[in-house]
């Protein structure tokens, strides 16, 4: 790994801002997390619970900033008028990670919250060989409701509500080619997003796709109070299954 000063810092990758966390003692297997942020762009740098877990497990974290892109393969004008968030992650973030940290799939785990939670699942479903390990906290899966409610950015990205629905993470699940390790959780008092997590669980179960989920633990609804509550379980899931992937291919 190229020497980086430990702690949080900001970099520019592919012309866009990106937050990095470097632990004092990185793990010996080049495990690394990519964190996908939510719609309000709140940084993990401000969340001591997550930072402590990353430090404890020796996990570098790369956290790209893509505005309200929903981590899709659609042009989001407030992010970039030429490149989608999906292409940015695949074409710029992954090569940057390999160059700077000598880490590459399947040693890269995805962690996301809210908009980024559905983004983590979306990437894992679309590219299960690249991202076999993903954890989503409060994933905003059925985000077509944002179109219905007049979200201007989503309306700039999609022609109608049905087009959004067809692009949701649930519709990207392949019954024969899925990520080997996925975890998602949602507070049952999260009135806006709990139903879409329940529908996702039902679809995965009906297809026989292995998954872990927690739709029972409650504590704060939708936001960082709940995200912090689920941080330890989510990071532990990622670390344990990155290790399983390493053992599987050695």
Model segments located where?
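Non-catalytic cap/lid and distal C-terminal segments of serine-dependent acyl enzymes
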Residues: 1-250
């Amino acid at each position: 790994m190229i020497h980086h000063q430990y702690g949080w810092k900001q970099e520019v990758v592919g012309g866009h801002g990106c937050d990095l966390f470097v632990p004092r003692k990185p793990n010996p297997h080049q495990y690394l997390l990519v964190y996908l942020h939510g719609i309000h762009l709140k940084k993990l740098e401000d969340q001591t619970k997550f930072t402590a877990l990353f430090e404890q497990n020796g996990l570098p974290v790369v956290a790209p900033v893509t505005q309200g892109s929903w981590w899709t393969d659609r042009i989001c004008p407030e992010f970039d008028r030429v490149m989608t968030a999906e292409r940015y992650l695949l074409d710029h973030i992954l090569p940057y990670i390999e160059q700077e940290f000598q880490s590459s799939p399947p040693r890269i785990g995805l962690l996301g919250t809210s908009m980024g939670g559905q983004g983590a699942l979306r990437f894992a479903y679309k590219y299960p060989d690249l991202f076999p390990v993903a954890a989503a906290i409060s994933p905003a899966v059925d985000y077509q409701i944002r179109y219905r409610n007049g979200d201007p950015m989503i309306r700039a990205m999609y022609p109608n509500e049905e087009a959004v629905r067809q692009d949701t993470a649930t519709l990207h699940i392949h019954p024969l080619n899925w990520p080997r390790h996925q975890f998602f959780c949602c507070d049952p008092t999260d009135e806006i997003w709990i139903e879409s997590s329940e529908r996702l669980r039902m679809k995965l179960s009906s297809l026989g796709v292995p998954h872990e989920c927690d739709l029972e633990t409650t504590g704060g609804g939708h936001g960082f109070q709940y995200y912090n509550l689920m941080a330890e379980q989510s990071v532990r899931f990622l670390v344990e299954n990155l290790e399983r992937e390493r053992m599987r291919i050695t």
